[in-house]
Amino acid sequence: MINYQSIKPWLFKLEPEDAHMLAEAALRIPNVCQVAFNPFLESHFITNSILKQELFGRTFFNPIGLGAGFDKNATMIRAMQILGFGFTEIGTITPKAQAGNPKPRMFRHIEEQSIQNAMGFNNEGLLSAQKRLKKRFPFTTPIGINIGKNKLTPDTQAINDYTTLIKALHELGDYLVINISSPNTPGLRDLQNEEFITKLFEESKAITSKPILLKIAPDMSKEDAVALTKLAVLKGADGIIATNTTVDYSLVKEPKSIGGLSGAVLKEKSFEIFEAVAKELYGKTTLISVGGISSAKEVYRRIKAGASLVQIYSGLIYEGPDLIKNINNELTELIKADGYTNITQAIGADRK
């Protein structure tokens, strides 16, 4: 197996989006010859019972998931299991295919181990995602589907985009995620308000009993984050994902003027919002933490703060395909060291 750190300098000479497309091409190979990757699956997909838990009616063999935005079109689901992820969140999917924002729209901040992206929900649309999901359904590991509105859809009609997606996709995933927190679709974050949240969840829960989660932005006060998430849960949200990328450009030395920051610079900002939400909602709903996570120590910090699951994206780019295996092995030891026999005992330990 090729050592990732030896090829990373070469990959990083490519434009970030070109490198991603190259990685996607490689990660689509298991779709046609999965058996060739069985040795990698056996070594990287950790099945230690200490990490196993039941959520959303499914078994999660470990708590590490792929964050939305990496597999936009449901082309790499099999590969993510081979890399060791306990679950995968695809998307963001919009009703109609859209090209996203003009290029260049993805940038590396290598010194800060971070990514800045202004992709703009580029994806092949609902019909394409639906076709791929149907072809591979049911899935060995849980699948989340992240959904968003089209750029040209007026805010007054945004709910129609979300309900259209829910109707078409709810039977093809294990949970759905309402994305109104990306900074790359004009006006999208303005939908993080009481009126829209109330109507959205009322209509969505009338369509399906499948879990529907809300993903929030980090660029709001703790008080606003708590108020928004409490309202969402009251209106029917089955979980909260905190957080999306940040537009706090002071976190990097040479920021671009567009897009959201992810990776190491987001770690503390995302944790602060997550912790504030967890203090109010731990034990009342399922909490998923994402933002700047790239080590077992940080995963365990989020778990003890109240996260049942965590998600990783930028860390995978900087650390490579062994990251998830290494985290799960180290996380197992951290849980054991605290005297627990299962991850569920550690979840929310700091809230008890």
UniProtKB/Swiss-Prot annotation:
Its cofactor is FMN. It comes from the Bacteria. It comes from Sulfurimonas denitrificans (strain ATCC 33889 / DSM 1251). It holds the Pfam family DHO_dh. Catalyzes the conversion of dihydroorotate to orotate with quinone as electron acceptor. It is a peripheral membrane protein. The keyword Repeat does not apply. It is found in: Cell membrane. This is Dihydroorotate dehydrogenase (quinone). The active site is at residue 182. It catalyses: (S)-dihydroorotate + a quinone = orotate + a quinol. Pathway: Pyrimidine metabolism; UMP biosynthesis via de novo pathway; orotate from (S)-dihydroorotate (quinone route): step 1/1. One of its GO terms (molecular function) is dihydroorotate dehydrogenase (quinone) activity. Belongs to the dihydroorotate dehydrogenase family. Type 2 subfamily. Substrate binds at residues 72, 117-121, 179, 184, 244-245. Binds 1 FMN per subunit. SUPFAM superfamilies: FMN-linked oxidoreductases (SSF51395). One of its GO terms (cellular component) is cytoplasm. The keyword Ribosomal protein does not apply.
